[in-house]
Amino acid sequence: MPPPKPVHSLRGPNKMLENFQCRSCAACSGELILDLGEQPLANNLLAPEDLAQPEPRFPLRLAVCTECWLLQITDLVPPVELFSNYIYFSSYSDAWTQHAAECAARYRDEFAPNYVIEIASNDGYLLRHFAEANTPHLGIEPAENIATVAREKGIKTRTDFFTEKLAQELAAEKPADLILANNVFAHAPDINDFVAGLKTLLAPEGRAILEFPHAVEMIAQDEFDTIYHEHVFYFTLTALEPVFARHALRVTRAERTPM
């Protein structure tokens, strides 16, 4: 299957970027797709007393690597700025909690996992279904305020960012036969470190299930509002399969989930 043709913005042909290096394949060939200028952080809500103060803004530009076709933003905001005191609780959404319950039931039936680890486990919205079934589990959640809520619900949770180094530490204790990562993979700026961590933490016959927005749908539906600093990457299978292959993993199934 030939690679997709470069996308062009409404302003005309895309601009080749200088000083670009793909975060996946390390190629130095990137085209600018969309430049939204400098924007404030999407979830950085201000207190009333701060409204008169200048709000921090960061460049927001979307580019595509012309070697591996991975869509990515060009300028990173440090994850500690974005996630250490996060304001989004997954349990606030009835649709999302229903989706989580259905997924948990399906995974228990299909895989019968003995140990489940969820990356970016938030407030325990998903792991609670495994806890209620007495399945050994661990949540990894970088936001202490949210991890505290999960622990109060009885969900075993570690406050940390997921990295290969952390995966090595956890795997030495017990590898996971099921790793879940919903709406976090696109947030991890070091994609190779993240995937290497999956490989390290998985048991020999283990599975990782990743859920994330699909770049094809984003483009087809003009969902430009999903482009913001938290979302470093915008994935297609074309761009993802080489990443997993690089770390001795492979895609065995891909599904679209209506939300």
For each feature predicted by the language model, list its residue ranges.
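Short, glycine-/aromatic-enriched active-site segment of Class I SAM-dependent methyltransferases
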Residues: 44, 210-233, 237-238
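Conserved SAM-binding motif I beta-strand of class I
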Residues: 136-141
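A conserved beta-strand element that flanks and buttresses the S-adenosyl-L-methionine
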Residues: 180
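A short glycine-rich, Lys/Arg-flanked "PGG" loop and its adjoining helix->strand segment in the class I
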Residues: 192-207
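N-terminal juxtadomain amphipathic helix
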Residues: 12-95, 255-257
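Conserved SAM-binding loop of SAM-dependent methyltransferases across substrates and taxa
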Residues: 123-134
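Conserved SAM-binding strand-loop segment of SAM-dependent methyltransferases
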Residues: 154-167
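Conserved class I S-adenosyl-L-methionine
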Residues: 112-122
